[in-house]
């Protein structure tokens, strides 16, 4: 590619003028162009303007003079821009089919002609493939504003391409739609019900008889006629009902039907001869909002038995209480004792009832540590009375487990935390109870009449017995976890909607929000009922659901769930983000794929939920992030014995710490609520449950300091919490995240300090980056040095 040749190891390009050319056809009808008698200048971009800095002195003088002919200057600028983009494309490891990643849309007709010449002559592309790329990158493929006679003296081959383009663009059909661009989709992203939305495509070349927008979902399939304004075809719609929808464009041509549907990115259009999956469109409730404080928060997740310990006999007294119920808890004598994962002599299977003795008073004693770390939201795994150490088998919904403390301890913790700017979110387990509970009372340990004692129990109707009392519906077949009937009126009144319900009581005791365990297991109408109950007590309390997949299009139990449409949840656990971050670090995907994933979440989640997503790297249900980064082995699903056989040498663990720093910067750079699983900021390791739930240890100060720096930077700069976001990839290794506030207001229109920050995440060798920010954001080019295997957030 002589057009993309470097000189002196700088970003300079040889631009050729005049001369003659010969078309040379091979036996297989491949075309090669031979040039002769050409003159050239060296071009370099200086302060955003292309300058002729060397080469033919006469040409340089003419190009730099005020009297330079317009056609000559336009060709020079167009050629230099096209060559720079082509080289950038090669250096970034992209195929030419993705040249649009490197070339902002060009309005110059000469740019289209010169790009076609480059693609066909220098790169060997066939005319159709070259035209498709050209249509994506250039406005004027029809050569409406081009004069080949004016161009002829400066570049005869490109002048000839003008006439070629003019001819082929009248016959060959190309169309452009980019769902990320306000030109084609306004507004971009999810829309509120009843909000007007314009969807457009540009007919870059060829002719059509008519075009229609096809809008469809689970319960509709509609067509809207589109009107044209020049090359732009548009339809205006205002969907009235919240739903996960899709759309595509139906083109009628003399040659038959064509469908403009997304390519693999999910947002860029391609023409197909048959209808394919469409572009996604989320319509959510018009009045849906999420708590502003939560969108700005930094979350810290605590497994209560393992985080902090009080210098008293709270835990030991709690152990004795559980023993009095006929249970078999064990209290470790030391934090150094290994966690138990095997069945005891009297058991046939492992029972997670070994305790280290963490307490609520212990958590309160660590509040200064959490405040210094920058935490503003504390998410506690279940704290109510239960048989197990994880407490997802609730025994008494209204009582703090005695091993942790008392209800009064909880209220005191909430008051103290709130005084330090920290709010507390509780974990609600409402799809099932424990079998050994006040409500089910399978073993008769509680004095109250439980469901297993007969129909006279006030809780009997909560459960579904197939054959009383031993055969009943239970969670995933676990007999210790009987499922409840969430549509039962008595259950709803006790747990959700009654004046003194479980949900409302804990909010009045000081909690500031709820995380709902296994939200998949709760019907949509029950989730909506919980939301209503929560908001009736505290409109500022978030409701967060455990959802492992894309919550917008999640299907379970035979239907599409409405988690993200504004009916029920404010937020979900963003496990897909964790998976994408790990895939990027382990080189299973590149920065372009990661960027596309981040854009897809930004576009498909309603903004109030998107900025509230719980962006996690680890939880009690995953292997710890440091461990996940130390190995490419998939740990989830392995037996506990096999997990313990995994060995990590010092080098692997050191590498994992470096990798975790990259993940942490990414986590704090994107919109949403960054969540730290206790101890991850100290570099704690651990495979799956229960080895990811070990007692908290202080360890890596450098890692801790990074998390504190990131959290406090986010807290001090609205741009990093509720500012707008732009995602870019320089090459396979470098991801860029631009966050900014302009005009004194954030994404939600709230008053906010102006500012802009750029996160640079580089998983590869040290290298310079230089990218053009999308035109609509008006940030121009962003460039700098990315150190080897590093991540940083810099002020722009």
Show which residues each predicted segment covers:
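A conserved ligand/cofactor-binding region detector
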Residues: 1-172
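Glycan-association/targeting regions that enable binding to alpha-glucans and other polysaccharides
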Residues: 171-296, 309
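Carbohydrate-binding surface patches
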Residues: 186-188, 195-200, 728-774
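C-terminal beta-strand-rich structural cap/linker in extracellular carbohydrate-active enzymes
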Residues: 205, 244, 298, 780-796
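Substrate-binding/active-site clefts of carbohydrate-active enzymes
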Residues: 303-376, 383-509, 530-536, 553
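Aromatic/acidic polysaccharide-binding cleft in carbohydrate-active enzymes
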Residues: 305, 557-558, 564, 570-571, ...
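Active-site-proximal helices and loops of the catalytic beta/alpha 8
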Residues: 414-423, 431-432, 437-448, 512, ...
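Aromatic- and carboxylate-lined catalytic core of secreted/periplasmic carbohydrate-active enzymes
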Residues: 696-730
């Amino acid at each position: 590619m002589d057009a993309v040749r470097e000189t002196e190891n700088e970003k300079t390009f040889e631009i050729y003028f005049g001369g003659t050319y010969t078309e040379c056809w091979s036996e297989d009808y491949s075309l090669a162009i031979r040039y002769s008698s050409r003159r050239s200048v060296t071009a370099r971009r200086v302060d955003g303007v292309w300058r002729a800095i060397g080469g033919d002195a006469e040409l340089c003088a003419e190009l730099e003079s005020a009297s330079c002919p317009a056609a000559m200057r336009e060709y020079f600028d167009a050629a230099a821009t096209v060559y720079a983009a082509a080289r950038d494309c090669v250096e970034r490891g992209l195929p030419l089919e993705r040249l649009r990643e490197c070339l902002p849309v060009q309005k110059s007709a000469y740019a289209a002609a010169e790009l076609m010449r480059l693609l066909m002559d220098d790169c060997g592309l066939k005319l159709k493939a070259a035209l498709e790329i050209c249509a994506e990158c250039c406005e004027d493929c029809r050569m409406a504003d081009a004069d080949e006679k004016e161009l002829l003296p400066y570049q005869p081959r490109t002048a000839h391409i003008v006439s070629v383009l003019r001819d082929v663009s009248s016959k060959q059909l190309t169309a452009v739609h980019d769902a990320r661009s306000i030109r084609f989709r306004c507004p971009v992203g999810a829309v509120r019900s009843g909000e007007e939305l314009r969807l457009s495509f540009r007919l870059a070349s060829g002719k059509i008889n008519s075009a229609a927008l096809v809008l469809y979902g689970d319960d509709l399939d509609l067509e809207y006629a589109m009107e044209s304004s020049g090359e732009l075809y548009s339809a205006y719609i205002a969907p009235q009902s919240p739903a996960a929808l899709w759309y595509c464009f139906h083109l009628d041509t003399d040659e038959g039907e064509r469908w403009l549907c997304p390519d693999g990115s999910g947002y860029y259009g391609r023409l197909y001869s048959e209808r394919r999956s469409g572009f996604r469109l989320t319509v959510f409730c018009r009045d849906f909002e999420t708590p502003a404080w939560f969108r700005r928060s930094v979350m810290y997740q605590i497994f209560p038995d393992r985080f902090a310990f009080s210098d008293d006999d709270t835990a030991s007294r709690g152990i004795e209480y559980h023993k009095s119920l006929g249970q078999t808890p064990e209290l470790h004598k030391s934090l150094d004792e290994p966690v138990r994962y095997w069945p005891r002599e009297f058991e046939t299977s492992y029972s997670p009832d070994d305790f280290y003795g963490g307490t609520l008073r212990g958590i309160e004693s660590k509040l200064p540590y959490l405040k210094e770390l920058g935490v503003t939201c504390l998410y506690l795994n279940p704290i109510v009375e239960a048989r197990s150490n994880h407490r997802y088998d609730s025994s008494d919904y209204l009582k703090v487990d005695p091993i942790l403390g008392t209800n009064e301890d909880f209220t005191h913790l909430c008051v103290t935390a709130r005084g330090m700017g920290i709010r507390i979110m509780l974990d609600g387990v409402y799809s099932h109870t424990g079998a050994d509970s006040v409500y089910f009372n399978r073993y008769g340990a509680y004095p109250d009449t439980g469901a297993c004692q007969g129909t006279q129990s006030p809780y009997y109707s909560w459960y579904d017995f197939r054959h009383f009392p031993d055969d009943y519906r239970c969670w995933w077949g676990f007999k210790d976890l009987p499922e409840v009937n969430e549509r039962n009126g008595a259950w709803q009144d006790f747990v959700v909607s009654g004046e003194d319900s479980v949900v409302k009581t804990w909010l009045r005791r000081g909690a500031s929000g709820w995380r709902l365990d296994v939200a998949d297991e709760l019907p949509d109408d029950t989730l909506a009922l919980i939301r209503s109950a929560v908001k009736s007590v505290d409109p500022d309390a978030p409701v967060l659901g455990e959802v492992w997949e894309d919550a917008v299009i999640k299907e379970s139990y035979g239907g599409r769930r409405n988690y993200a449409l504004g009916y029920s949840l404010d937020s979900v656990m963003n496990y897909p983000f964790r998976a994408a971050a790990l895939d990027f670090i382990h080189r299973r995907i590149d920065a372009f794929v990661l960027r596309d994933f981040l854009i897809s979440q930004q576009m498909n989640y309603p903004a109030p939920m998107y900025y509230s997503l719980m962006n996690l790297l680890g939880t009690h249900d995953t292997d710890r992030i440091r461990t996940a980064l130390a190995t490419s082995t998939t740990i989830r699903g392995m037996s506990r014995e096999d997990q313990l056989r995994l060995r990590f040498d010092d080098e692997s663990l050191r590498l994992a710490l470096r990798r975790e720093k990259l993940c942490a910067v990414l986590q704090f750079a994107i919109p949403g609520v960054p969540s730290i699983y206790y101890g991850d900021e100290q570099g704690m390791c651990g495979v799956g449950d229960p080895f990811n739930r070990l007692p908290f240890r202080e360890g890596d100060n450098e890692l801790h300091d990074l998390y504190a720096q990131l959290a406090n930077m986010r807290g001090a700069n609205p741009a990093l919490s509720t500012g707008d976001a732009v995602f870019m990839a320089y090459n396979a290794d470098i991801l860029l995240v631009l966050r900014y506030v302009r005009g004194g207001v954030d994404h939600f229109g709230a008053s906010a300090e102006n500012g802009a920050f750029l996160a640079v995440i580089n998983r590869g060798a040290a290298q310079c980056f230089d990218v053009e920010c999308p035109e609509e954001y008006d940030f121009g080019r962003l460039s700098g040095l990315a150190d080897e295997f590093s991540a940083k957030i810099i002020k722009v």
